[in-house]
């Protein structure tokens, strides 16, 4: 088991200095050893439109292929906020044209987004691996995740989906019975329930493929939220937090590391203020302390740190790496990002 280390806060100019690199390399252990990892892709890895996604996944595929070449065994999960919102809007518009058409519920839209996003990632990564002479199966698994029907999240929706809307568009959403949240100076965004995940229904299928050293894309968008009703599974009108399911997936697969890719290069202390400073590493206790201090914003960095804490409490030999797509290659070598250890 790794020894806990005090958190390291560095200035931007120190991010690639030799001392910073040496410290992180020692904490990470032998980078050439085989590692089972869950990689969680954020919005930046996928874009917001079909065209943006097509271009973005090519860049994402190169970064993921780099990890495969470094002998990482990958299980990939991804965001779907913009995609599920786009699909839901399209299905709603279809209802306006065809009055007898039944609008697609959120769970169905989530299922569609898993296939849509998984298809692009799967094919782009497969092509990138083959271009490097690597023949490795890449598969997307439609994944359901059980939730508690009495989860308090159903009574207080907080999960943001889709792009910013004008006040007029927000009022239309409210009339439909949907929840919206205002962001001063930016506009409005739709919010839905984000219940906690209980069990990943298809975990055995995911585990079987992962143990066969195949690249697996699963739990897209947090998974399709379902409620158990005797032997049946009923879709829930909700979206599961992708970071929460990424942490659970890493626990269920007993992974060596959880890699969370986001819009920023690392975790920052006092983010957005004049005192802002990057955190190179922190241990589990320090992560909890930062959470209690309110250092991380809800809906952005907070769920990532909470997922890291949950994973490390259950897999004490593991580690969590938080960085951006741009710096992932340097981060896995200990030159960038934020490393969280037990």
Predicted stretch roles:
Residues 5-6, 14:
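Intrinsically disordered, low-complexity repeat tracts enriched in Pro/Ser/Thr
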Residues 33-342:
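C-terminal catalytic "cap/lid" subdomain
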Residues 3-4, 26:
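Polybasic, lysine-rich low-complexity intrinsically disordered segments
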Residues 13-31:
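Short, Lys/Arg-enriched N-terminal segments with co-localized hydrophobic residues
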């Amino acid at each position: 088991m790794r020894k806990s280390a005090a958190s390291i806060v560095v200035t931007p100019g120190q991010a690639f200095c030799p001392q910073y690199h040496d410290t992180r390399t020692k904490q990470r252990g032998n980078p050439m050893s085989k590692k089972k990892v869950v990689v969680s892709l954020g919005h930046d890895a996928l874009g917001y439109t079909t065209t943006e996604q097509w271009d973005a996944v090519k860049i994402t595929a190169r970064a993921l292929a780099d990890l495969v070449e470094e002998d990482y065994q990958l299980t990939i999960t991804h965001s779907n906020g913009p995609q599920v919102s786009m699909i839901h809007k399209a299905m709603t518009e279809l209802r306006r044209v065809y009055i007898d058409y039944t609008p697609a519920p959120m769970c169905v839209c989530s299922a569609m987004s898993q296939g849509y996003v998984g298809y692009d990632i799967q094919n782009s990564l497969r092509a990138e691996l083959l271009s490097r002479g690597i023949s490795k199966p890449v598969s997307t698994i439609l994944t359901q995740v059980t939730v508690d029907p009495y989860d308090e999240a159903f009574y207080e929706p907080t999960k943001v989906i889709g792009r910013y809307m004008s006040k007029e568009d927000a009022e239309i959403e409210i009339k439909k019975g949907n929840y919206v949240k205002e962001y001063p100076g930016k506009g409005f965004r739709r919010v839905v329930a984000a219940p906690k995940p209980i069990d990943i229904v298809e975990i055995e299928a995911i585990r079987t493929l992962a143990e066969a050293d195949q690249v697996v894309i699963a739990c897209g968008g947090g998974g399709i939220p379902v409620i158990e009703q005797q032997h049946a599974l009923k879709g829930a009108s909700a979206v599961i937090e992708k970071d929460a399911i990424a942490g659970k997936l890493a626990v269920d697969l007993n992974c060596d590391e959880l890699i969370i890719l986001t819009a920023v290069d690392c975790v920052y202390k006092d983010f957005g203020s004049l005192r802002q400073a990057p955190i190179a590493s922190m241990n589990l206790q320090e992560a909890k302390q930062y959470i209690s201090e309110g250092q991380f914003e809800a809906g952005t960095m907070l769920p990532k740190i909470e997922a890291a804490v949950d994973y490390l409490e259950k897999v004490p030999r593991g580690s969590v790496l938080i960085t951006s797509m741009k710096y992932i290659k340097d981060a896995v070598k200990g030159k960038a990002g934020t490393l969280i250890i037990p």
